[in-house]
């Protein structure tokens, strides 16, 4: 996650590091496939109860525009994160097309991951904060996110 609400240099750095990983993989003949962990924000912004179709050619240009917009909201951390994931993944696929390496690229787009905090001092500064909000009865903090359940 970005440690600033400024998109530069975070978005460019994430994109460059992603391409660098692909270049490194291409230089090693034993690499058969690369899996890029992207984000659902690379394809779409979270929008509760808004039906839509997502395809391999769906890109969240909206999040990139919002990240670079001076009129964006004050806390742009998630917006910048989403823009970095979209920019990096899109550039990765462009790089694959331009360079035709010997390996296959696959991309996964999870929406939210929960697990133990790597750094206990910052345990509630990321997605774990959503769990704490729900535990503390502040579930309204998550109203802007779509439901993470399936009714059977």
For every predicted segment, state its role.
Residues 99-151:
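NAD(P)-dependent short-chain dehydrogenase/reductase
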Residues 39-75:
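Active-site "gating" loop of Rossmann-like NAD(P)-dependent oxidoreductase/epimerase domains
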Residues 4-5, 45-49, 118-120:
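Short, solvent-exposed loop/turn and secondary-structure capping segments
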Residues 29-33:
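A short helix->loop->beta-strand "cap" motif at the edges of active sites that frequently abuts
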Residues 27, 62-105:
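Active-site Tyr-X1-5-Lys
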Residues 1-17:
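NAD(P)H-binding glycine-rich loop region in Rossmannoid oxidoreductase-like domains
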